[in-house]
Amino acid sequence: MTAEAAEKSVEEGLSSSGSAGSSGTRFDLDKETELRFEVEAGERVQLELLSGLAEIFGSELNRNKKYTFGPGSKIAVFTWQGCGVALSGKTEVAYVSKDTPMLLYLNTHAALEQMRRQAEKDNERGPRVMVVGPTDVGKSTVCRMLLNYAVRLGRRPTLVELDVGQSSVSVPGTMSALCIERPADVEEGFSVQAPLVFHFGSTTPGTNIKLYNKLTSSLADAFSQRCEVNRRASVGGCIINTCGWVKGSGYQALVHCASAFQVDVVLVLDQERLYNELKRDLPHFVRVVLLPKSGGVVERSKDCRRETRDEKIREYFYGFRGTSFYPHAFDVRFSDVRIYKIGAPSIPDSCLPLGMSQDDTQLKLVPVSPGRDLTHHVLSVSSVDDEAEVGQSRGILESPACGFIVVTAVDTQAQVMTVLSPAPRPLPRHTLLIMDIRFIDLK
């Protein structure tokens, strides 16, 4: 399963606004080419497949159905046999490219499927795959593609989401696992039903690397337990999406993840240095494969990342495009909940109790007194039993989140806070974990 290709930027087609005529601009694609387009800020673009067959990140398009993409969307419509599509609406850029790594990605899928068939035959477990690389090389897209191709063949792979900044499964600041049972919806992505979600509390692993590694191990244990009782999940294996921090402690976190999940395959996108380091440091039986990134991958600004995070939280409360769900606002008494932050502030080693290290403080539960500074913070509702001993850190750290709320107002005199919740009162549990992430509800 080797894949080393130097990308050449051979692009055909002119940039188009996609606004000519009532039916939009038509693009006729030859086989094994893709139409790439980006949607302008504040705009929406409609795509329609007119003839032939095409897919977006491994999800097949239906003919004569109009798909709508919101502001900032970056889409690639690929065809294996050739097709005709129409675009209507304002695009920032729209062009057809012959130069795509899709054949390499398909070959990767074929090799993984061969491993699944062998696992079925030998009554072994299927491939556990980790996708790594720096930021903005298309890791999430490759994961989505490989999962879609697997599930289209009737497999039941698991997506493990370790990107705490740009999670595709839950709100930012979480680490999660999701069993994939059907291909991703072209517009909405994967159906997120009954994911396993752990609270991390920040958008960067570096804020608490010990907690990050601990939760990685917790997800690996949970996945292994599921594989023991579910043969289809075991054969389907997992695809692990990682974050783009690949140096120092970030690199060590990748090595830890490979060990915790006992990965068989590591796909390295667009960085030879990382490829060679992993080849050197991982066990010899782990296949490390270097793959090129797509020429359509776009670098995202900090503002773009923040907007994406806000949209993900908004989607959690209001549904896709803010139309499907109706969240509830209600008051919660301070006395009814226990609020904690994971990780105590760093203090000089000389001030620590005898025998205690800085690492120990990273997993410490610090009680938070409700006050006005809690306003707009996202809180995880821990699934830990309310009868658990107050401050029992291990139970709270290792318990998944059963949901999330946002504090919209705090009344210190009345000793209550108003929260936005996806479900009506009362809260299912009363142990809350505070995130560094804020969300201002403008609805």
From Swiss-Prot:
It catalyses: a 5'-end dephospho-2'-deoxyribonucleoside-DNA + ATP = a 5'-end 5'-phospho-2'-deoxyribonucleoside-DNA + ADP + H(+); a 5'-end dephospho-ribonucleoside-RNA + ATP = a 5'-end 5'-phospho-ribonucleoside-RNA + ADP + H(+). Residues 13-24 have a biased composition (Low complexity). GO terms for cellular component: mRNA cleavage factor complex; nucleus; tRNA-intron endonuclease complex. One of its GO terms (molecular function) is ATP-dependent polydeoxyribonucleotide 5'-hydroxyl-kinase activity. It is found in: Nucleus. The keyword ATP-binding applies. Keywords: ATP-binding, Kinase, mRNA processing, Neurodegeneration, Nucleotide-binding, Nucleus, Transferase, tRNA processing. Its main location: nucleus. Strong neural expression. Residues 1-27 are annotated as: Disordered. The keyword GTP-binding does not apply. InterPro entries: Clp1, Clp1/Grc3, Clp1_C, Clp1_C_sf, Clp1_N, Clp1_N_sf, CLP1_P, P-loop_NTPase. Its EC number is 2.7.1.78. One of its GO terms (biological process) is cerebellar cortex development. It comes from the Eukaryota. ATP binds at residues 34, 74. CDD domains: SIMIBI (cd01983). Residues 1-11 have a biased composition (Basic and acidic residues). Disruption phenotype: Lethality before 5 days post-fertilization (dpf). Mutants display abnormal swimming behavior, abnormal head shape and curved tail. Defects are due to neuromotor defects and cerebellar neurodegeneration. Belongs to the Clp1 family. Clp1 subfamily. Polynucleotide kinase that can phosphorylate the 5'-hydroxyl groups of double-stranded RNA (dsRNA), single-stranded RNA (ssRNA), double stranded DNA (dsDNA) and double-stranded DNA:RNA hybrids. dsRNA is phosphorylated more efficiently than dsDNA, and the RNA component of a DNA:RNA hybrid is phosphorylated more efficiently than the DNA component. Plays a role in both tRNA splicing and mRNA 3'-end formation. Component of the tRNA splicing endonuclease complex. Component of pre-mRNA cleavage complex II (CF-II). This is Polyribonucleotide 5'-hydroxyl-kinase Clp1. It comes from Danio rerio. The lineage of its organism: Eukaryota, Metazoa, Chordata, Craniata, Vertebrata. The gene is clp1.
